[in-house]
């Protein structure tokens, strides 16, 4: 039941976009059509599922105070937590290159449509934010970290695909000239955020 609760909360209550505003640059830039948004959303899910459990292991066995005690008593008091940002980003950047090569090889059309935003997953704050939240919340095991990664990724994917679908519909609407483009997009995102706020009072 704890896993189900964590999964649902990470999608709706603690949504990366609407609760923490993480990954907004690519969220706004790549949400012009559903197909491209779906591709980036799946890439973000894959990155979170791969990197967050790896960073959990890195945090548990290397970074936290006393984590290196398995190397011997002389390492029992070593605290490498100050290296969290650097090492988390290194793991994320390494696997971003792998994802980029896979997408370029097997999905060239998607690779072309995503453009610079695919390699920029390496510095997507939603990916890094997932690892930092994992560290802050001190999950009890790697299973919780994996469930949180999956839920957070699905939440981000849901947000970008929903916005892309709305923006496709808006392209056929008579939007006032002063609000066309990013203006009406900001209003739409704000209304979506208000809708997701309804989940924040739910206790799971």
Located regions from the model:
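Ordered, amphipathic secondary-structure segments that act as subunit-interaction surfaces
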Residues: 60-114
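Cytoplasmic-side transmembrane-helix entry/capping segments in multi-pass membrane proteins
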Residues: 36-46, 86-88, 110-121, 176-184
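C-terminal ends of transmembrane helices
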Residues: 22-36, 96-110, 163-174
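Helix-coil boundary and interhelical linker segments in multi-pass alpha-helical membrane proteins
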Residues: 1-4, 59-82, 131-146, 201-204
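Hydrophobic core segments of alpha-helical transmembrane domains in multi-pass membrane transport
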Residues: 22, 26, 44-53, 89-98, ...
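Generic transmembrane alpha-helix signature in multi-pass membrane proteins
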Residues: 21-29, 101-106, 117-118, 125-139
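C-terminal transmembrane helix-loop-helix hairpin of multi-pass membrane proteins
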Residues: 5, 140-204
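Structural signature of hydrophobic alpha-helical transmembrane segments
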Residues: 5-18, 78-92, 147-159
């Amino acid at each position: 039941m704890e896993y189900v609760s964590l999964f649902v909360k990470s999608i709706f209550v603690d949504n990366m976009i609407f609760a923490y505003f993480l990954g907004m640059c690519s969220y706004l830039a790549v949400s012009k059509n559903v197909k491209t948004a779906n591709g980036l959303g799946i890439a973000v899910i894959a990155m979170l599922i791969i990197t967050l459990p790896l960073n959990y292991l890195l945090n548990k066995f290397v970074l936290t105070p006393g984590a290196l005690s398995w190397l011997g008593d002389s390492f029992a008091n070593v605290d490498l937590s100050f290296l969290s940002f650097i090492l988390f980003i290194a793991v994320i950047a390494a696997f971003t290159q792998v994802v980029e090569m896979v997408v370029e090889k097997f999905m060239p059309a998607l690779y072309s449509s995503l453009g610079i935003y695919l390699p920029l997953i390496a510095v997507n704050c939603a990916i890094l934010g997932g690892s930092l939240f994992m560290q802050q919340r001190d999950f009890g095991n790697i299973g919780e970290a994996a469930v949180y990664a999956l839920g957070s990724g699905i939440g981000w994917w849901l947000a970008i695909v929903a916005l892309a679908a709305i923006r496709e519909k808006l392209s056929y609407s008579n939007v006032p000239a002063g609000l066309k483009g990013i203006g009406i997009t900001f209003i739409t995102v704000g209304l979506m955020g208000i809708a997701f706020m309804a989940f924040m009072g739910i206790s799971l």
